[in-house]
């Protein structure tokens, strides 16, 4: 989800690829020890410049990996930037759809399928 301020009201939007029901985001994971010896698992999702579909809502977007790039991205033997950097591109225009959803997405107490329901018709009727 990403939020956009419209008429002094913040509106959340759901984003999803248009061409595939399941997708993967480029991310990094590390297991390490801090100075006290405590073991820590950390992760991050990589973002890049937004494509023209996402730019009206936000200036950045997660890097969506193509299915044919999954093996390369997940292979720990692949460590040369020349092999990995070409995978870190914004999705081409037309490959990401977005629509407004309920503000209920803001609360972790809410966890149900209606959170991803498109509410554009409700907004238009208000």
Predicted regions and their residues:
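A structured binding-face within diverse protein domains that lines the active/interaction site
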Residues: 1-126
């Amino acid at each position: 989800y990403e939020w956009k301020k419209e008429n002094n009201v913040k509106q959340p939007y759901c984003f999803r690829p248009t061409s595939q029901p399941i997708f993967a985001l480029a991310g990094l994971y590390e297991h390490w020890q801090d100075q006290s010896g405590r073991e820590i698992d950390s992760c991050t999702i990589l973002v890049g410049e937004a494509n023209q579909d996402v730019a009206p809502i936000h200036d950045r977007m997660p890097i969506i990996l193509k299915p044919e790039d999954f093996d390369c991205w997940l292979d720990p033997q692949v460590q040369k930037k020349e092999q990995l950097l070409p995978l870190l591109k914004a999705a081409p225009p037309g490959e990401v759809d977005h629509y407004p959803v309920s503000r209920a997405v803001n609360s972790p107490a809410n966890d149900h399928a209606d959170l991803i329901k498109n509410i554009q018709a409700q907004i238009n009727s208000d």
